Design a protein with these regions (language model features):
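Non-heme di-metal
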Residues: 1-117
Length: 117
């Protein structure tokens, strides 16, 4: 993605880092279950910071789409299809993704692409 910042913003913050938003709550629960509350608290801080990273990428992605006359949502899903064969892993952390700049419609479309259903 180094050759195109639009592609980088779509795939690094809005796909890879956003996946961190999805999986962190489950990891936190596992640490809580074994009594490691300190690690769970650290992961909560990391989750909050990760929302900011994804939000930053979302803003830049939308800005770059606007500069190129591209519709952001369709462009994002076209890139997911081209680079990931349109398949993603779930579950999604809807609240964190919304806070990070994903629309409800994007979340619905992402859910439809989840592996296995």
């Amino acid at each position: 993605t180094a050759h195109d910042p639009l592609i980088r913003m779509a795939l690094v913050p809005r796909m890879l880092e956003a996946r961190g938003l999805d999986v962190t709550p489950g990891i936190m629960r596992r640490f809580e279950a074994i009594g490691d509350h300190e690690t769970a608290a650290v992961l909560q801080i990391i989750l909050r910071e990760e929302v900011g990273h994804v939000q930053f990428g979302s803003r830049w992605f939308h800005y770059l789409c606007e500069q190129r006359g591209l519709e952001p949502e369709q462009t994002y899903f076209d890139l997911l299809e081209n680079f990931l064969n349109g398949e993603i892993r779930c579950p999604l952390h809807h609240e964190a993704r919304r806070e990070a700049g994903f629309s409800n419609q994007e979340l619905q479309r992402l859910e439809a692409l989840c592996a296995g259903g």
